[in-house]
């Protein structure tokens, strides 16, 4: 797996990587159930005994990339839970901040106890880059109200917000399967089709989301100016 950030689970590495083996229909089911518990249980069904992690230039905010942070290293381990606990520490999270890591430990998939970590370095060690503690993903998440959203839909929304629209938004944007059959003010994706202002698509692209939100803001400004 690539060591990288994730817009919903904060990190994705050894444990969540196994979700890629599932068919798309089952992936959507994971989101409907809430990602963390199914990911933890997946670790019981798919055993990993050697994990080689690509930490060359992953994006530490979003799983789809776009903002690579160059580390130029690989690391390997035998315990997927311990690997993910280490990744949490590297990205300034505690294992408790990523619920599926602790859940997997409680299920017996592995250990999240970093005191059990034994690191052996191979090859020359270059200048170590310090991973920033505060990253934009947290601020952008505050603008979104998500319930059982799929990673693709959520992942496209975050870059759209990043394009300068965030300060102009007054309402939270609703997204996710949990809004099916419900009403509201502002939503993106087909699951929010009952909302007063909605962008359909499963998922709509980041360009479509950007144009939709830009138009939404422009319409609101015009309405306010006419009052």
Regions found by a protein language model. Give the residues of each.
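Extended, low-polarity segments enriched in aliphatic/aromatic residues
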Residues: 1-227
